[in-house]
Amino acid sequence: MIAIVKRLAGFPKAGTDWDKPPWEEIRPERVGNYMGEKPDHFPRTEVKIAYAEKAVHVLFRVEDRYVRAVSAKHQDPVCRDSCVEFFFTPGPDLSQGYFNLEMNCGGTLLFHFHRNGREGGIEIPGRDCDKLVKTHSLPRIIDPEIAEPVTWTVGYAIPTALLSRYCPVSAPRPKALWRANFYKCADGTSHPHWLTWAPVDDSKPNFHLPQSFGLLAFE
């Protein structure tokens, strides 16, 4: 899987306007594969990614049901809520480690760096998490679960200088390559599912498989 990452001059702070400038210029990627058994509830999940001079910008859009958000502070287990995730190595070399950036529909964040696989994760400190410009269209807490159809967006701008504190970074510019995958999950809801952008060949849901990452090609 390859996603083309366009540069947009003067890109604003993260926003939820999926079909308005500048996001309207970005082609969405579909998070349309799944792990484990095919879920009964298969929310349509798309993601857009772009870059500007000092940050990479990501925006997810989910046509969902059975939505909840109970994790309230950074590094809580947001994967148990209605959640989207961006796992990435900021370069082509997987041996440099990878980040997992997870956000529930209410905008609560889990952000770790993994040098040596899943068990060797490092929590990104709160002062660094706060440097991400975050946005979300739903309230921070959703409890009880919303069973009716609802479309939600979350997004963030990731400063590339922040990433370089943890590993080498291939600066976003034409011909730069990163490795990545995008995910959608909802482990603790009434209709759990584990969706992926790039296919992951594993019998059980497990997003921590960087060897299955696709490519982000900057232009």
Predicted regions mapped to residue ranges:
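Structural preference for beta-rich elements and adjacent junctions enriched in aromatics
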Residues: 1-219
